[in-house]
């Protein structure tokens, strides 16, 4: 068999490279759509094809979601997608490293590790940080034991830490370093008007009014039916300077006496207290 000329060999090789279709190559054919996720099959001049993927998809058949669609790369890193695998890697900016570029080669969070006692360091900028402390610790670098952990503030007060000490913000009516002391409002005269008697209560006080006066400070004249004490639509009728009776609606007559008696007991008790 005569040897083939070099020129003929090159011509045959070029023809094969141009027109041969590998057995595994993607092909676009009528009635067959290899591309998924709304990808479009495009044919090359040699008969092979490829899938032109819509935004958000990649891969030979557009079968992968674009892993860079939600860029996980931190600190200015660039997401680089591997289309065939549907995976991505981060190309980090100068000064950062790690799978997601989350580590700085010079930031205090990773060089000096300033957060103590198990605290977590968060980068705020290239050289500033903030520590999230474990329960029981406080301070810029979680260096102090939380003085509020023992709940030193009493009577519903609010505890705040200042350095390694605590400070209590007391509710009205209490005082002291730990808000443990009740303020006796009755030590200051003038709270109760028209001869009312001041009664000290925990964190507050109450005025016991003389007959004929009412209100928080005994500052209002008492009128038995203003406002009406009668319930369920009953009508109040004043029977004396400081007494009343309730006239009930017909549908509540059967239980009206019971309601009236209960209200009268409450009123009589209140009237008795005010005497």
Swiss-Prot record:
A biological-process GO annotation: cerebral cortex development
GO cellular component: extracellular region
This protein's record includes keyword Transport: no
Transmembrane segments: none
Residues bearing attached sugar chains per UniProt: 46, 155
Tissue expression pattern: Expressed in radial glia neural stem cells during cortical development.
GO molecular function term, any single one: Notch binding
UniProt-listed Pfam families: EGF, EGF_CA
Coiled coil: none
Domain EGF-like per the UniProt entry, residue ranges: 26-63, 64-102, 105-143, 144-180, 182-219, 221-258
Subunit structure: Interacts with NOTCH2. Interacts with DLL1; the interaction is direct.
The family this protein is said to belong to: Belongs to the NOTCH family.
Designated name of the protein: Notch homolog 2 N-terminal-like protein B
Organism expressing this protein natively: Homo sapiens
Upper taxonomic lineage: Eukaryota, Metazoa, Chordata, Craniata, Vertebrata
Gene name linked to the record: NOTCH2NLB
